[in-house]
Amino acid sequence: MKVFVLTKKNLIAAGLILAVIILAVVLAIVCSDRSTEPNVGTDPSPDPNAQIGNEVESYELAVFAGLQKELPVYSVSREDKKIALTIDAAWADDKTEFILETLNKYNIKATFFLCGFWAEKYPDIVKRIDAEGHQIGNHTATHPHMNKLSSQQILDELKKYDDILESIIGKRSTLFRAPYGEYNDNVITTVRNAGYEVIQWDIDTVDWREERSAETILNSVLPKLKPGSIILSHNNGFKIEQYLPTLIETALGQGYEFVTIGELLLDGTTIIDVNGVQKPAN
């Protein structure tokens, strides 16, 4: 019969092994899917920013455990003061004309992430967005929960959307934003391998919440502005007609320059750090 002696060294080794096993189990539960928006059925436009802090924390734990997670671009490391206004469009278009007129008034460009069914319903608006120099990204064809899709289903969503977009403006997209802000490794890897950059945001107006006043939105957004920031708004945001002009005027007054996502992203070889910041690789 073999006799095992529990020395201090053995106990430490066993404890480390147990800790790694527990951490792996926790990560499997916490990090497998990142769901960051409320149910679309209850909100006119979802809020994908609710748990960004938890996502980053989970990502750092995954790196520690050797289970590194993929991240989209939340912001860009820039020495200049370029920032990007992004507008998700999936419901209605009654405020889109106001948004475009406001952007024209201040001579700035934005990036619109459209859903395929929205683009099909409002092709003239899509044409105007493109004609006025704004960038258009892929927000999927049907606004599904991407974490629940297979790689092929993800690719089908991307292709169906771009087929719709191309039929309207003769162009396909190179940027992608996930519905509900949801993503996992498979979503990001599949989308990037298909030739898109995955774009999130570091500043959320949360303008889909009807109870948020324009003042509340501005007081939340403006102090967070920094070079390379990506702002999330919605084309049908409740208070967008009240807050957007002030947001733009204030940012311009602070020396910021609004550009499209394509102009904001860095050229050359880049990395995305644990906070989702795109940086030069060297």
What are these regions, as identified by a protein language model?
Residues 93-98, 144-171, 182-227, 240-243:
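Alpha-helical scaffold elements lining the catalytic groove of polysaccharide deacetylases
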Residues 2-86, 92-105, 216, 248-250, ...:
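N-terminal pre-catalytic segment of deacetylase/amide-hydrolase enzymes
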Residues 126-128, 152-154, 214-216, 272-277:
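Short low-complexity, flexible loop/linker segments enriched in glycine and/or proline
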Residues 55-149, 153, 157-164, 171-173, ...:
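Active-site beta->alpha N-cap acidic-glycine motif
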